[in-house]
Amino acid sequence: MQLLLIHSDFIEYEVKKSTPVAEKIEDAVRSGRMEEALTAFAAVEKPDESNPQYVIEKGLEAIIKVAEQVKTTRVMLYPYAHLSANLSSPKMAVEVLKGLEAALKGKGFEVARAPFGWYKAFTIKCKGHPLSELSRTIRPEGVEAVSVTPAVAAEKPEVVSEAVKAEEKLKSYFYILDVDGQLKDPKTFDYKGHDKLKAFVDYEMAKKRAVDREPPHVELMRRLELADYEPGSDPGNMRWYPKGRAMKNMLEQFVLSEAAKKGAMEVETPIMYDMEHPTLKKYLDRFPARQYTVIADKKNLFLRFAACFGQFLMNHDMTISYRNLPLKMIELTRYSFRKEQRGELVGLRRLRAFTMPDMHTLCTDMDGAIKEFGDQYEMCINTLDTIGIDIKTDYEVAIRFTKDFYNNNTPFIQSLVKRAGKPVIVEMWEERFFYFVLKFEFNYIDSLNKASALSTVQIDVENAERYDINYVDQNGNRQRPIILHCSPSGAIERCIYGLLEKEAMESEKGAVPMLPVWLSPTQVRIVTISEKHVPFAEALADRMCNVRVDIDDREETVGKKIRDAGKEWIPYVVTIGDAEMNGDKIPVVVRAESQQNKPAKVEMTVEELVERIHKETACLPYRPLPVVRSLAKRPKFVGSI
């Protein structure tokens, strides 16, 4: 059982609506108020079912002890499922809460119990003294105790690497590195014309990652039927609808293709590894991430948070010559897992399960690594630009390094800033704790001024030795390579987040939002005026080879059909009536050329429309329409019909 104990001036509640597991109640308990009370928010858990009487007795002891400390004889028992992710059955929860209520009354306490299984509005006024907010965990004998903080779900103690702990304590210094090559104090830097850089600097220095309100992309990802929360899973694990899956697939194929052009070989490796593997155990403590853990056959396993493990173990077993270097391998992880803090999770911005293109490059020495770093920096800029995220306006650059590396490679770091064409934030460490000496990230700044890392490259000086990775040089001697870690785009989900946030901000400025044509789930929508025009529309769609076309053949007004196409950000909308059936050209509303409330209509042939779309999407991945072509036959994934 989890208890959150609040000494309150008052607590009051009002029942609103029953859930499927609601207990039957009398009218008298549909609302309640208690003053000068100890409010006990309680969640009965699965392990409690093994010995409920023990849990009642120990819960009684815990509540009485706190009540005596705060000098009250009034207790409000309030069922609060949000304290745990491992709840008991509803029947057991009611049994334990009723047992606890009776036990408290038997000890002379004035007790009220809010009903179980009902949605309730409640108001509480906490007294605010040192003992006014306490938490307690009750476990049956033989069950391992797990402590929780107030209002946080009870979980097994999370596995936190030494790198995470160090990151929380590590001292570093922030500067602005300008295009003139000078390091400047971020507190006195003139941010005129660099509003997003200022927002990023504030975000970095405050280190506040928790979410206080929902960003616009959350509503958009649902309205566009791309993705949604999955209540049946752990927070930060999403469901993807057909349109979103198609977008993800094309982004994945694009990034893999760009890596292949640079000589990267695609591999696939396991998603879980042994925590006691001597090499992996050391690496866990050098990587700043929190892990999911799995117990199987008495083994403690962790779910990977990157593809490093599998690729490095593969590198260890390979025979590598200096002639093979630089050697690149890439894996598109579906998925990588990081147990991000619950308060930081929101939409597609920060997830616990995500799709990450993860490329590693083995280089002969530091000079070779620096050259590759510069090449991959350029690759990342170009990758995001094609996706639709521009270095000039959409993201800010962070470069992080040790002081020694900066002093030895200042001109190279300055060249990165010049390529960005704008000042960047740099973070300098006095000494190296992590496995890398240099890294950059491209950080997208959203409408709430939160930053999220996209592309990144790191120079790794530890893991070749840790994993015993070698290559044979010209003299036949074994040497350790320098390793680059690169994600050309960052997490695929974050790319979609960035596109949606960008268009939300553009819309606020009066622009017409749209996705890049190559990523739009539907590229052309054909709107029929009446049922008799449907066969012609179908024939028209058949002529549009390698274009994603759907047909709005619903029994709706033409106006509604066109408005709905606008809400879905369809790049090209064609309306078909009698005139179009008898003519050579069709009227096409071109979204990219339109203004709000002022659509741009262009007359063109079907062949001209197809040619235009093929030019806009040339050399980019193509997927067929991911949903049923007929809107009349298409199910809705979000909302009601």
Curated annotation (Swiss-Prot):
<feature type="region of interest" description="Catalytic">
    <location>
        <begin position="216"/>
        <end position="516"/>
    </location>
</feature>
<feature type="region of interest" description="Editing domain">
    <location>
        <begin position="1"/>
        <end position="154"/>
    </location>
</feature>
<dbReference type="GO" id="GO:0006435">
    <property type="term" value="P:threonyl-tRNA aminoacylation"/>
</dbReference>
<dbReference type="InterPro" id="IPR023509">
    <property type="entry name" value="DTD-like_sf"/>
</dbReference>
<dbReference type="InterPro" id="IPR002314">
    <property type="entry name" value="aa-tRNA-synt_IIb"/>
</dbReference>
<dbReference type="InterPro" id="IPR036621">
    <property type="entry name" value="Anticodon-bd_dom_sf"/>
</dbReference>
<comment type="similarity">
    <text>Belongs to the class-II aminoacyl-tRNA synthetase family.</text>
</comment>
<keyword id="KW-0436">Ligase</keyword>
<comment type="function">
    <text>Catalyzes the attachment of threonine to tRNA(Thr) in a two-step reaction: L-threonine is first activated by ATP to form Thr-AMP and then transferred to the acceptor end of tRNA(Thr). Also edits incorrectly charged L-seryl-tRNA(Thr).</text>
</comment>
<dbReference type="InterPro" id="IPR047246">
    <property type="entry name" value="ThrRS_anticodon"/>
</dbReference>
<dbReference type="InterPro" id="IPR006195">
    <property type="entry name" value="aa-tRNA-synth_II"/>
</dbReference>
<keyword id="KW-0648">Protein biosynthesis</keyword>
<dbReference type="GO" id="GO:0000049">
    <property type="term" value="F:tRNA binding"/>
</dbReference>
<keyword id="KW-0963">Cytoplasm</keyword>
<keyword id="KW-0030">Aminoacyl-tRNA synthetase</keyword>
<dbReference type="Pfam" id="PF08915">
    <property type="entry name" value="tRNA-Thr_ED"/>
</dbReference>
<dbReference type="Pfam" id="PF03129">
    <property type="entry name" value="HGTP_anticodon"/>
</dbReference>
<keyword id="KW-0067">ATP-binding</keyword>
<dbReference type="InterPro" id="IPR045864">
    <property type="entry name" value="aa-tRNA-synth_II/BPL/LPL"/>
</dbReference>
<feature type="binding site">
    <location>
        <position position="308"/>
    </location>
    <ligand>
        <name>Zn(2+)</name>
    </ligand>
</feature>
<keyword id="KW-0820">tRNA-binding</keyword>
<keyword id="KW-0862">Zinc</keyword>
<dbReference type="InterPro" id="IPR002320">
    <property type="entry name" value="Thr-tRNA-ligase_IIa"/>
</dbReference>
<keyword id="KW-0694">RNA-binding</keyword>
<dbReference type="GO" id="GO:0004829">
    <property type="term" value="F:threonine-tRNA ligase activity"/>
</dbReference>
<comment type="subunit">
    <text>Homodimer.</text>
</comment>
<dbReference type="GO" id="GO:0008270">
    <property type="term" value="F:zinc ion binding"/>
</dbReference>
<dbReference type="GO" id="GO:0005737">
    <property type="term" value="C:cytoplasm"/>
</dbReference>
<dbReference type="InterPro" id="IPR015011">
    <property type="entry name" value="Threonyl-tRNA_syn_edit_dom_arc"/>
</dbReference>
<dbReference type="InterPro" id="IPR004154">
    <property type="entry name" value="Anticodon-bd"/>
</dbReference>
<keyword id="KW-0479">Metal-binding</keyword>
<keyword id="KW-0547">Nucleotide-binding</keyword>
<protein>
    <recommendedName>
        <fullName>Threonine--tRNA ligase</fullName>
        <ecNumber>6.1.1.3</ecNumber>
    </recommendedName>
</protein>
<dbReference type="GO" id="GO:0005524">
    <property type="term" value="F:ATP binding"/>
</dbReference>
<feature type="binding site">
    <location>
        <position position="360"/>
    </location>
    <ligand>
        <name>Zn(2+)</name>
    </ligand>
</feature>
<dbReference type="Pfam" id="PF00587">
    <property type="entry name" value="tRNA-synt_2b"/>
</dbReference>
<feature type="binding site">
    <location>
        <position position="485"/>
    </location>
    <ligand>
        <name>Zn(2+)</name>
    </ligand>
</feature>
